[in-house]
Swiss-Prot record:
It comes from Morus indica (Mulberry). It is found in: Plastid, Chloroplast thylakoid membrane. The chain crosses the membrane at residues 70-93, 156-179, 195-219, 291-309, 346-369, 385-411, 433-455, 531-549, 589-610, 664-686, 724-744. Chlorophyll a binds at M683, Y691. The gene is psaA. The PsaA/B heterodimer binds the P700 chlorophyll special pair and subsequent electron acceptors. PSI consists of a core antenna complex that captures photons, and an electron transfer chain that converts photonic excitation into a charge separation. The eukaryotic PSI reaction center is composed of at least 11 subunits. GO terms for biological process: photosynthesis. GO terms for molecular function: 4 iron, 4 sulfur cluster binding; chlorophyll binding; electron transfer activity; magnesium ion binding; oxidoreductase activity. It is an enzyme of class 1 (oxidoreductase). [4Fe-4S] cluster binds at C573, C582. This is Photosystem I P700 chlorophyll a apoprotein A1. Its EC number is 1.97.1.12. The lineage of its organism: Eukaryota, Viridiplantae, Streptophyta, Embryophyta, Tracheophyta. It is a multi-pass membrane protein.
Length: 750
């Protein structure tokens, strides 16, 4: 007789038909809240409706219901993303010069939008080359399409339709998993299973399928394109997949199929899975064979990682065990209890994810120019500048969001009674030391970084250039940064002998790569000017961290307001009779942090824009002489504040200011309009609520006189609402102003 362990019972992890589908709720704005559902008495109602519509915590305290709402909303978000993506591909198919660009990417600009001839605005359709008139785009889609092997507009149409189908599918999934088969709380908390599926499925199989697409479709098509074959002559993607002989003509080892893989003779595949480093001199992008190799390697790593965690089979890691074992001699209970926090507080989970994703997005910004991944991306200066700026802004917002949700976690989900002597408790107990030290660092960095500039401005104003900090007077060379550059430049001979070139040309050592007479990339020299602005970066980032971290660590209590947790995440003041307690809520710290995030990112993108125009981007003559856009003026001019104002902001704003009457005039209008939006924000930020309430009451009096007063009583925005509207317009106005300034400049000179 065989003794077998009893079969594990299959756990039912969904509830069937938990909530009936009804459109009646749609007709009842605010149905999620008893107060808001009553309808408006005052105009504050519409603001509360918007503030609370997605604040699922305030609608129910049932964690399972909150989880289901968030899960369902994610499908809605994915649906919108697919819809947007479909629109991008449709524009490429219907309104773009993609096929013309593909035939001559160095002389023809990418355009996917043609303005209708109404009120004379067809002036905006500039000549992008090849006889096509339209708006030059800087999103990088053309370069991605070429890299993925798209050769005609029909393929773009098909992809656009495919994305629409997926958008519909996601909408359906959002409805289905809330109304028909809603997951139980246990399913959302099963982190090992989630890790396995996300690592092996999303990242592992996702990377593997992309690597497969690159090898079987992108590489052969790009090989033909680089050789100058007419796109119409190139076999279609499915022909490469179905007919191995076609691929074997380009890569002979394909004739052997999978034999080398199973006989461990992997070097046979080195034709299309390379380890070259550097850039392809034809396109100025990374070698696509390097990229395919990278995705294959990443896929293996994630497929292994997706089998590491313990689920039904009793082998593998358990996250709870890992966290609880993680303690050192000086950290008390270490990470004990963190598992419970992260499986019951989605704010804590989201906070970590936002912090990591934000940092990763900023890493992406820096890799897009130093290791340009797509063909002809590096020589499209407008796209390079846009991609860097875009990813920097996104990263900044995500990191502030991380602090916001960390603070919401502290206020709503943190239970101090169950936490003792773990890392979080220890950090909270010595928060005064952390914040006061951080404050000292900010003061030190602020005075010293700005002080170096003020010294230079003073010496420059007094006509004493020999006493300035610059490469030609008192040098402050960034020796550590230069050492890192050299280490990487020498890596192919030393630490990475398999590579022929270092990871990025920017490290130094290598020659420049030019495509079609334009510089793609070259070694980037760092000097005193970079040393100075680097310390401004350090200063602004530390101040942002100070504000955000103070908001998180003092979200529940402070010496000023010991019971802050009872007042909630956002509140204007600690009630009447408590002077000097306004603007101390966790929300207010996020509000202030946003301004410093804006400062930080602005300095970074200004530094990038000027540095690249001065020391990297430009044209190259037949004799090999490089002429940079601003002629290398960064090293001398950017060492004074006056230099930044005069030689960067003012000198480079001439294109946007003089754009009227040209195809760039839309940027001139946006520059003006965005300045106005920015200035409009100051009206909300620099005035008090009482002022507006008094004004409104006068206006209501006039309406009553004329018997046209509305039933809904007008009210001034609350203090928090006013600041929210203010910071929104400040950021949108500032970002749109910068966008217009950058693009008008780089499209005109790039």
């Amino acid at each position: 007789m065989i003794i077998r362990s009893p079969e594990p019972d299959v756990k039912i992890l969904v509830d069937r038909d938990p909530i009936k589908t009804s459109f009646e709720e749609w007709a009842r704005p605010g149905h999620f809240s008893r107060t808001i559902a009553k309808g408006p008495d005052t105009t504050t109602w519409i603001w509360n409706l918007h503030a609370d519509a997605h604040d699922f915590d305030s609608q129910t305290s049932d964690l399972e219901e909150i989880s289901r709402k968030v899960f369902s909303a994610h499908f809605g978000q994915l649906s919108i993303i697919f819809l947007w993506l479909s629109g991008m591909y449709f524009h490429g198919a219907r309104f773009s010069n993609y096929e013309a660009w593909l035939s001559d990417p160095t002389h023809i600009g990418p355009s996917a939008q043609v303005v209708w001839p109404i009120v004379g605005q067809e002036i905006l359709n500039g000549d992008v080359g090849g006889g096509f008139r339209g708006i030059q785009i800087t999103s990088g889609f053309f370069q991605i399409w070429r890299a993925s092997g798209i050769t005609n507009e029909l393929q773009l149409y098909c992809t656009a339709i495919g994305a629409l189908v997926f958008a519909a599918l996601m909408l359906f999934a959002g409805w289905f998993h809330y109304h028909k088969a809603a997951p139980k709380l246990a399913w959302f908390q099963d982190v090992e299973s989630m890790l396995n599926h996300h690592l092996a499925g999303l990242l592992g199989l996702g990377s593997l399928s992309w690597a497969g697409h690159q090898v079987h479709v992108s590489l052969p098509i790009n090989q033909f394109l680089n050789a100058g074959v007419d796109p119409k002559e190139i076999p279609l993607p499915h022909e490469f997949i179905l007919n191995r002989d076609l691929l074997a003509q380009l890569y002979p080892s394909f004739a052997e199929g999978a034999t080398p893989f199973f006989t461990l003779n992997w070097s046979k595949y080195a034709e299309f899975l390379t380890f070259r480093g550097g850039l392809d001199p034809v396109t100025g992008g990374l070698w696509l064979t390097d990229i395919a190799h990278h995705h294959l390697a990443i896929a293996i790593l994630f497929l292994v990682a997706g089998h590491m965690y313990r689920t039904n089979w009793g082998i593998g890691h358990g996250i709870k065990d890992i966290l609880e074992a993680h303690k050192g001699p000086f950290t008390g209970q270490g990470h004990k209890g963190l598992y419970e926090i992260l499986t019951t507080s989605w704010h804590a989970q989201l906070s970590l994810n936002l912090a990591m994703l934000g940092s990763l997005t900023i890493v992406v910004a820096h890799h897009m120019y130093s290791m340009p991944p797509y063909p002809y991306l590096a020589t499209d200066y407008g796209t390079q500048l846009s991609l860097f700026t875009h990813h920097m802004w996104i990263g900044g917002f995500l990191i502030v969001g991380a602090a916001a949700h960390a603070a919401i976690f502290m206020v709503r989900d943190y239970d101090p009674t169950t936490r003792y002597n773990d890392l979080l408790d220890r950090v909270l107990r010595h928060r005064d030391a952390i914040i006061s030290h951080l404050n000292w660092v900010c003061i030190f960095l602020g005075f010293h970084s700005f002080g170096l500039y003020i010294h230079n401005d003073t010496m420059s104003a007094l006509g004493r250039p020999q006493d300035m900090f610059s490469d030609t007077a008192i040098q402050l060379q960034p020796v550590f940064a230069q050492w890192i550059q050299n280490t990487h430049a020498l890596a192919p001979g030393a630490t990475a002998p398999g590579a022929t070139t270092s990871t990025s040309l920017t490290w130094g050592g290598g020659d420049l790569v030019a495509v079609g007479g334009k510089v793609a990339l070259l070694p980037i020299p760092l000097g005193t000017a970079d040393f100075l602005v680097h310390h401004i970066h350090a200063f602004t980032i530390h101040v942002t961290v100070l504000i955000l971290l103070k908001g998180v660590l003092f979200a529940r209590s402070s010496r000023l307001i010991p019971d802050k947790a009872n007042l909630g995440f956002r509140f204007p003041c600690d009630g009447p009779g408590r002077g000097g307690t306004c603007q101390v809520s966790a929300w207010d710290h996020v509000f202030l942090g946003l301004f410093w995030m804006y400062n930080s990112i602005s300095v970074v993108i200004f530094h990038f824009s000027w540095k690249m125009q001065s020391d990297v981007w430009g044209s190259i003559s037949d004799q090999g002489v490089v002429t940079h856009i601003t002629g290398g003026n960064f090293a001398q001019s950017s060492t004074t504040i006056n230099g930044w104002l005069r030689d960067f902001l003012w000198a480079q704003a001439s294109q946007v200011i003089q754009s009227y009457g040209s195809s760039l005039s839309a940027y001139g209008l946006f520059f003006l309009g965005a300045h106005f939006v920015w200035a409009f924000s100051l009206m909300f930020l620099f005035s008090g609520r009482g002022y507006w309430q008094e004004l409104i009451e006068s206006i209501v009096w006039a309406h009553n006189k004329l018997k046209v007063a509305p039933a809904t009583q007008p009210r001034a925005l609350s203090i928090v609402q006013g600041r929210a509207v203010g910071v929104t317009h400040y950021l949108l106005g500032g970002i749109a102003t910068t966008w217009a300034f950058f693009l008008a400049r780089i499209i005109a000179v790039g």
